[in-house]
């Protein structure tokens, strides 16, 4: 079976309002059923709430939140001699960003009540302050990698 070359990575287009590629990725993650305009309204509304509540530039708060959420190491399962080991590996920069955005949106969705823009704003502000579900997920991921450091020599 012939193999075709690797598919080239597509560059994300910066969003029209803030000119941020990270915000485009957040919008894409929030989007459900291809409804981009709804996702944009949610994200821009959330950033407006962040601006009102913190008095800071919302993109700065989002950048800080992403820094606090993006994992440096994660564990990947590796089968060795009939046993599965969780092997700690470093996370690539693009995956780091993807995981950060994914965790922020998923933990925002899990928050009780209110509208999605309020939940997303709350999760972004919590992450920027170093608390919240997404930051806890990152810490758990790092703790798991630290606990399995003994299997680091199985890295591939």
UniProtKB/Swiss-Prot annotation:
<dbReference type="GO" id="GO:0003735">
    <property type="term" value="F:structural constituent of ribosome"/>
</dbReference>
<dbReference type="GO" id="GO:0015935">
    <property type="term" value="C:small ribosomal subunit"/>
</dbReference>
<comment type="similarity">
    <text>Belongs to the universal ribosomal protein uS7 family.</text>
</comment>
<keyword id="KW-0699">rRNA-binding</keyword>
<dbReference type="GO" id="GO:0006412">
    <property type="term" value="P:translation"/>
</dbReference>
<dbReference type="InterPro" id="IPR023798">
    <property type="entry name" value="Ribosomal_uS7_dom"/>
</dbReference>
<dbReference type="InterPro" id="IPR020606">
    <property type="entry name" value="Ribosomal_uS7_CS"/>
</dbReference>
<dbReference type="GO" id="GO:0000049">
    <property type="term" value="F:tRNA binding"/>
</dbReference>
<dbReference type="GO" id="GO:0019843">
    <property type="term" value="F:rRNA binding"/>
</dbReference>
<comment type="function">
    <text>One of the primary rRNA binding proteins, it binds directly to 16S rRNA where it nucleates assembly of the head domain of the 30S subunit. Is located at the subunit interface close to the decoding center, probably blocks exit of the E-site tRNA.</text>
</comment>
<dbReference type="Pfam" id="PF00177">
    <property type="entry name" value="Ribosomal_S7"/>
</dbReference>
<keyword id="KW-0694">RNA-binding</keyword>
<comment type="subunit">
    <text>Part of the 30S ribosomal subunit. Contacts proteins S9 and S11.</text>
</comment>
<dbReference type="InterPro" id="IPR036823">
    <property type="entry name" value="Ribosomal_uS7_dom_sf"/>
</dbReference>
<protein>
    <recommendedName>
        <fullName>Small ribosomal subunit protein uS7</fullName>
    </recommendedName>
</protein>
<keyword id="KW-0689">Ribosomal protein</keyword>
<dbReference type="InterPro" id="IPR005717">
    <property type="entry name" value="Ribosomal_uS7_bac/org-type"/>
</dbReference>
<dbReference type="InterPro" id="IPR000235">
    <property type="entry name" value="Ribosomal_uS7"/>
</dbReference>
<keyword id="KW-0820">tRNA-binding</keyword>
<keyword id="KW-0687">Ribonucleoprotein</keyword>
């Amino acid at each position: 079976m012939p193999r075709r070359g690797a598919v080239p990575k597509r560059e994300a287009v910066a969003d029209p309002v803030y000119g941020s590629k990270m915000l485009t990725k957040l919008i894409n993650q929030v989007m459900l059923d291809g409804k981009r305009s709804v996702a944009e309204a949610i994200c821009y509304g959330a950033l407006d709430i962040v601006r009102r509540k913190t008095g800071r530039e919302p993109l700065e708060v989002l950048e800080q939140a992403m820094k606090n959420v993006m994992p440096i190491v994660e564990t990947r399962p590796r089968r060795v001699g009939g046993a599965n080991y969780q092997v700690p590996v470093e996370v690539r920069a693009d995956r780091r960003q993807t995981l950060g955005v994914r965790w922020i949106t998923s933990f925002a969705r899990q928050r009780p009540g209110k509208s999605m823009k309020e939940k997303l704003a709350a999760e972004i502000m919590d992450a920027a302050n170093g608390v919240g579900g997404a930051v806890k997920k990152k810490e758990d991921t790092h703790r798991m990698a630290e606990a399995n450091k003994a299997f680091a020599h199985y890295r591939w």
